[in-house]
Amino acid sequence: MAQPELDLSKAPAHWGMNFTETTHQQPSRSIDPSNVTFPQGYTVVVIGAGKGIGEHIAKAYVQARAENIIITSRTGSDLDRVKKELETLAQQTGQAVKVSTLVQDATKPESYTKLKDLLEEGFNGRLDTLVFCAGGGPVGTLWTPRIDETDVDEWNESIALNFTGSYYAAKYLVPLMLRPQSQGKTIVNITSAASHFTGGNITPASYSIGKLALNRFTQILGENYADQGLVVVAVHPGSSPTPGALGSMPPSLHNILTDDQGLCGAVCVWISKKKREWISGRYICATWDMDELESKKEEIVKEDKLKWRMAV
């Protein structure tokens, strides 16, 4: 079946693509990570940093002079490459940055116990910001709009990669984040605007469902630990020509891949650099103007916006 082109500028209002009047395809000056300096010892974990959005998120935290960066991926060669690039970038900031790597299958709980051990042994159990960026667009049978034609194993893998791993990350790593030495207490879950979609010929159902579950989990996690200062935000990273997107999306949908891969990283740093309890449990788009978003703070909190609910 031919895939239709997708024009996000004509998206329904409830998708929230234009929640701020101003939108961006590249980081604006006000969220430039290079203008940020995190406190001494600041420790960041980026799960799924071997390429694409995750790689650029890690780069943004290096630009912001986070002292410790731990990156994970399934592929060791990707981690080796990204580590070298991060270390080169760190030299340009004039601040020493320790980059550590862990080969990890984000769908397996034992991967997170290993990550916890790494943080305990190498970083005094400190974890300030956790970015869950594992995920990916489905391939194979999952692009069919007919559920009966999908492969069960491909379906389960897609859900595990785009959602279940975030549960494992929270279960094993949140206890570290609640310790006194972990000052940032921030989780960013990389979601997708696809969580709004229901048409299987535009985005696979398993991907939409996985990201929708991630959004609700973000809200639940934020509410669970609000009294302990944990801030949890779901971020749509924009639509970027990442290796994953280009490799999984039909060519007819490549027209929407126009956002800079570094945009999401800049927004993640913006979330981390200051306590923003008012956006905890909510969904935001990296393409939004963050100054405009902050100006809507009272409206967002009063009307409890940017959360999933049923229209009745």
UniProtKB/Swiss-Prot annotation:
Q: At the top level of its lineage, which domain of life is listed?
A: Eukaryota
Q: Quick one: which pathway?
A: Pigment biosynthesis; Secondary metabolite biosynthesis
Q: Where is the active site?
A: Y207, K211
Q: Which InterPro entries match?
A: NAD(P)-bd_dom_sf, SDR_fam
Q: Which signals induce this protein?
A: Expression is significantly up-regulated at the end of late growth phase, in the presence of Butyrolactone I. Expression is positively regulated by the pgm cluster-specific transcription factor pgmR.
Record bears the keyword Cell wall biogenesis/degradation: no
Which key words are in the record?
A: NADP, Oxidoreductase
Q: Name one GO molecular function term.
A: oxidoreductase activity, acting on the CH-OH group of donors, NAD or NADP as acceptor
The disruption phenotype is:
Only abolishes the production of pleosporalin A but not of the 2 other final products.
Among SUPFAM superfamilies, the record links this protein to:
NAD(P)-binding Rossmann-fold domains (SSF51735)
- Identify which top EC class this enzyme belongs to: oxidoreductase
Residues binding NADP(+): V46, I47, K171, Y207, K211, T242
Under Pfam families, the record lists: adh_short
Q: What is its EC number?
A: 1.1.1.-
Q: What does this protein do?
A: Short chain dehydrogenase; part of the gene cluster that mediates the biosynthesis of pleosporalin A, ascomycone A, as well as a third cryptic naphthoquinone derived pigment, all responsible for the coloration of conidia. Essential for the production of pleosporalin A, but not the 2 other final products. The pathway begins with the biosynthesis of the cyclized heptaketide 3-acetonyl-1,6,8-trihydroxy-2-naphthaldehyde by the NR-PKS pgmA.
Q: Which family does it belong to?
A: Belongs to the short-chain dehydrogenases/reductases (SDR) family.
Protein name in the entry: Short chain dehydrogenase pgmD
Native organism is Aspergillus terreus
